[in-house]
Amino acid sequence: MQLNPSEISELIKSKIEGLSVTSEFRTQGTIVSLTDGIVRVHGLSDVMQGEMLEFPGGTYGLALNLERDSVGAVILGAYEHLTEGDIVKCTGRVLEVPVGEALLGRVVNALGQPIDGKGPVAAQGMEPIEKIAPGVISRKSVDQPMQTGLKSVDSMVPIGRGQRELIIGDRQTGKTAVAIDAIINQKGEDMICIYVAIGQKASSIANVVRKLEEVGAMAYTIVVVASASESAAMQYIAPYSGCTMGEYFRDKGQDALIVYDDLTKQAWAYRQISLLLRRPPGREAYPGDVFYLHSRLLERAARVNADYVEKATGGKVKGKTGSLTALPIIETQAGDVTAFVPTNVISITDGQIFLESDLFNAGIRPAINAGVSVSRVGGAAQTKVIKKLGGGIRLALAQYRELAAFAQFASDLDEATRKQLERGKMATELMKQAQYATLKVSEMALTLFALNKGYFDDVDIKRALAFESALKSHVRSHHAAILDKIETTKELDAETEKALEAAIQEFKQNGIY
């Protein structure tokens, strides 16, 4: 077979035309030092702040310090296989995590990778962990309640959808218990929950996941884990990853709740990273931008208007508002709320639930200090019936605390003071609630109504909780229609009041408690 020159030239021409050459331009550098998960890389001339860097063996890192002749980065994951002189590549991408409904019911790490042994996650997409919070015009005022199912919280420090409410207290005062109860109470409320565990023992996290599975709460919950055994870098990015997962639902016109447990550990991790990166230390050895660390995270929790949702979904969702409610947890040392991180987060959030060791040890659980705890915006969102009935509870408890201190020194008390003390004692007793025993609005309203109307006045304080439990059972069994009406309307009209009074009087006359 012979080929003439014209055929050869045509063949070569067709081959050249069909040739696909893909070139990839990526800056490369080399590791010059590696210490405690912090690397210094030389030669990355056009790296971005917060860019993902690719190390040998499929390991990734995060560029944090951009200096004149080197880049300081943290490694995300194992780094035992890395050595000085290894090649590092820029990726041109910032750190992203998977988002979407597929994550519900899953336990993932700070990078969104599943760690529950249930196989890969078929995510709806990838989103950057660092995002700019919605602007002023995009926001809507908080006016819808987020019920926690806890009498003391919903009556005294109500939380609204889109609010940031801090839970603060010493270790072992029940901070996580309040947050987990809030998650459990969202069952059937069309609320997506994200629980971010930072720097906790793996056994504690396993117990939380087990409990959420038992009560059927994992169906609407995502658990993001950066346990105490993981690197400081993973503990630092975990809250941002969880927030991005929550924002996906907020921007679709849904309601989401995120718990950061706890941000003190994140601040410690960030301090560790900053000191290893040789950033100048400030107060309590924290870096200068520790306030920004938490403010840029918590400002992303908001209630957004329908225009924002429509724009975010490309016009697919119209006329719906979305919200992301945040419950950050801060651990104090010996009740000191004037320390650096607690004061920062108190100033960023819309109120705080302050838990006290003394109250906890006295058996008052949740151990909420009514005088110091406050909700700055939740009042506008509070359920009408609870607002009407619970208005005097907080004042009664605060006055009781004050009077109780004086009563220790006074030998004889006048009738009015004695009554106030008795009412305060009873209110304190009735605010007690077992863990995982969340209440419906109607059940809460029943207790508050009976307390306000004086039906507990002749009950022995030691029998108060048993009386309350028996009363609820009686009304639920014989007058379920009253509770159903309160649950549906979330209001208490004159007719319902009369019916409730009659039901309570009937119960007291029978005396079955």
UniProtKB/Swiss-Prot annotation:
Record site: Required for activity: 373
| Compartment(s) where it occurs, according to its Swiss-Prot or TrEMBL record | Cell inner membrane
Source domain of life is Bacteria
- Give the matching PROSITE patterns: ATPASE_ALPHA_BETA (PS00152)
Q: How does it sit in the membrane?
A: Peripheral membrane protein
Q: What's the catalysed reaction?
A: ATP + H2O + 4 H(+)(in) = ADP + phosphate + 5 H(+)(out)
Q: What class of enzyme is it?
A: translocase
Q: Would the keyword Cell inner membrane turn up in this protein's UniProt record?
A: yes
InterPro entries associated with the record: ATP_synth_asu-like_sf (IPR023366), ATP_synth_asu_C (IPR000793), ATP_synth_asu_C_sf (IPR038376), ATP_synth_F1_a_nt-bd_dom (IPR033732), ATP_synth_F1_asu (IPR005294), ATPase_a/bsu_AS (IPR020003), ATPase_F1/V1/A1_a/bsu_N (IPR004100), ATPase_F1/V1/A1_a/bsu_N_sf (IPR036121)
GO molecular function terms noted in the UniProt entry: ADP binding; ATP binding; proton-transporting ATP synthase activity, rotational mechanism
Q: Name one GO cellular component term.
A: proton-transporting ATP synthase complex
Give the keywords, sorted. Answer: ATP synthesis, ATP-binding, Cell inner membrane, Cell membrane, CF(1), Hydrogen ion transport, Ion transport, Membrane, Nucleotide-binding, Translocase, Transport
CDD domains this protein is in? ATP-synt_F1_alpha_C, ATP-synt_F1_alpha_N, F1-ATPase_alpha_CD
The residues listed in the UniProt record as binding ATP, with positions renumbered to this chain, are: 169-176
The EC designation for this entry is 7.1.2.2
Does Translocase count among this protein's keywords?
yes
Q: Which family does it belong to?
A: Belongs to the ATPase alpha/beta chains family.
Assembly and binders = F-type ATPases have 2 components, CF(1) - the catalytic core - and CF(0) - the membrane proton channel. CF(1) has five subunits: alpha(3), beta(3), gamma(1), delta(1), epsilon(1). CF(0) has three main subunits: a(1), b(2) and c(9-12). The alpha and beta chains form an alternating ring which encloses part of the gamma chain. CF(1) is attached to CF(0) by a central stalk formed by the gamma and epsilon chains, while a peripheral stalk is formed by the delta and b chains.
Function as written in the Swiss-Prot or TrEMBL entry: Produces ATP from ADP in the presence of a proton gradient across the membrane. The alpha chain is a regulatory subunit.
Q: What is this protein called?
A: ATP synthase subunit alpha 1
Native species of this protein?
Nitrosomonas eutropha (strain DSM 101675 / C91 / Nm57)
Its lineage opens with: Bacteria, Pseudomonadati, Pseudomonadota, Betaproteobacteria, Nitrosomonadales
Q: Which gene encodes it?
A: atpA1
